[in-house]
């Protein structure tokens, strides 16, 4: 697992924009074109890290059960059925048995079995794969199979997230397609996805578009839409233009200034929804030149705290997103009913930040007032994906706030896939994530 630290900067109140849909059975069929600012990068669930990939893979594959519309993960009764049609807890709440829906089939016609569930867990836990699910699965000791349709999760300890961890963290993968492929080969590139979802992959033109089509024989019934296309425009302005010109039906990242243009486009309407996003400043805790060593700056916890206190998050949020976002309570979505808004946070306190930097030996030098220690200037590079206009605008504001504190920040804008690759390899100092 990569070791990172983050300062949560903004929680987006959201803006889901779409052409007005019809209603009733006559509205079934057709194509939905979604304008988006980044390519998914991968459609192999263990490696999914961006929103686009998550949106697509969740249509192709299924969880055993999924979080319901109220987003309450505390009560399993609020979860929606997925591949499992029922489940049963043991008396001590340390085992959870899922029964796979016997009607569920893979897109190639093969039956879904409990072995697929067991294989999916083992693959995601395999350190040789280097997937992203280590933390989420830490409390699950193992998965066993009692019959062809029953998979049993064995937990290390009771916790409030047991059901969520077992039911809705893993998109179930086909053992018959993947289990004979060496893990190293899966890391280099997985085969085309075979899922159980109500859509199957038709075409992926990397960097341009992804198209999925309805699985007409799906065990839950055919999807209402015939197909969905994600149209990739790496530049934010291009993505918005596709919506307004009618080349796309939906864009879910409108900014406040875009709302002023809506009066000219009667075929487009806006729906404001609580957002599921937050932006954050991510510190790399390992040295990009040698991952065995701590980062020469951010390996110091007190330095990270000083930088955190030097950032006025409220000003950043208001300047970039006006009233359409809130300062988050941490790296968590406010829309979740489990989010406690009273959580303790480091405050914006420039005087305290300055004193802490001085005590660490980072003192102001020269006419420009930049801080230095043992001949090294307190400076780092911040990478920003060009797919996010919010983060592009936030970068210079953050840069200026830290300059006033004597910290030099160099901004580096990168195409989204390049930025994501840099983060995955640990080849960065800090990043604006979201």
Where do the protein language model's features map onto the residues?
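Gly/Pro-rich hinge or "lid" segments in bacterial periplasmic/extracellular proteins
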Residues: 68-74, 167-223, 227, 237, ...
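Append "and occasionally in soluble cytosolic enzymes with long acidic Gly/Pro-rich linkers
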Residues: 211-216, 297-400
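Aromatic- and charge-enriched surface segment that lines or borders ligand/interaction sites
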Residues: 85-130, 146, 152-154, 230, ...
């Amino acid at each position: 697992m990569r070791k990172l630290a983050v300062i949560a900067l903004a929680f987006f109140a959201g803006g889901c924009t779409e052409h007005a849909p019809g209603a009733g059975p006559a509205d079934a069929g057709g194509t939905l074109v979604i304008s988006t600012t980044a390519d998914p990068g991968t459609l192999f669930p263990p490696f999914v890290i961006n929103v686009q990939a998550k949106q697509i893979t969740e249509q192709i594959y299924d969880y055993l059960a999924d979080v319901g519309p109220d987003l309450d993960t505390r009560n399993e009764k609020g979860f929606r059925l997925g591949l499992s049609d029922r489940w049963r807890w043991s008396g001590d709440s340390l085992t959870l048995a899922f029964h796979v829906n016997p009607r569920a089939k893979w897109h190639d016609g093969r039956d879904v079995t409990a072995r697929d569930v067991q294989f999916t867990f083992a693959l995601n836990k395999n350190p040789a794969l280097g997937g992203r699910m280590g933390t989420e699965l830490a409390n699950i000791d193992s998965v066993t199979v009692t019959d062809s349709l029953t998979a049993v999760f064995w937990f290390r300890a009771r916790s409030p997230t047991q059901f969520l961890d077992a039911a809705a963290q893993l998109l179930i993968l086909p053992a018959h397609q993947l289990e004979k492929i060496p893990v190293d080969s899966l890391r280099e590139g997985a085969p085309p996805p075979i899922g159980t979802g109500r859509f199957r992959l038709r075409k992926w033109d990397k960097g341009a578009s992804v198209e999925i089509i309805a699985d007409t024989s799906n065990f839950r019934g055919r999807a209402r839409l015939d197909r969905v296309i994600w149209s990739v425009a790496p530049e934010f302005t291009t993505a918005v233009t596709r919506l307004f010109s009618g080349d796309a039906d939906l864009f879910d990242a409108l900014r406040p200034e875009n709302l002023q243009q809506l009066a000219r486009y009667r075929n487009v309407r806006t729906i404001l929804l609580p957002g599921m996003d937050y932006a954050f400043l991510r510190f790399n805790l390992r040295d990009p030149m040698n991952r065995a060593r701590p980062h020469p700056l951010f390996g110091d916890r007190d330095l990270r705290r000083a930088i955190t206190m030097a950032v006025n998050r409220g000003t950043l949020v208001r300047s970039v997103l006006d009233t359409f976002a809130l300062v988050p309570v941490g790296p968590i979505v406010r829309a979740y009913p489990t989010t406690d808004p009273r959580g303790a946070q480091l405050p914006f306190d420039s005087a305290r930040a300055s004193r802490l930097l001085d005590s660490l030996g980072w003192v102001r030098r020269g006419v420009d007032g930049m801080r230095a220690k043992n001949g090294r200037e307190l400076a780092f590079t911040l990478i920003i994906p060009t797919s996010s206009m919010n983060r592009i605008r936030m970068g210079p504001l953050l840069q200026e706030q830290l300059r006033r504190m004597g910290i030099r920040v160099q901004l580096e804008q990168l195409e989204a896939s390049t930025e994501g690759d840099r983060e995955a390899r640990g080849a960065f100092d800090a990043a604006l994530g979201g």
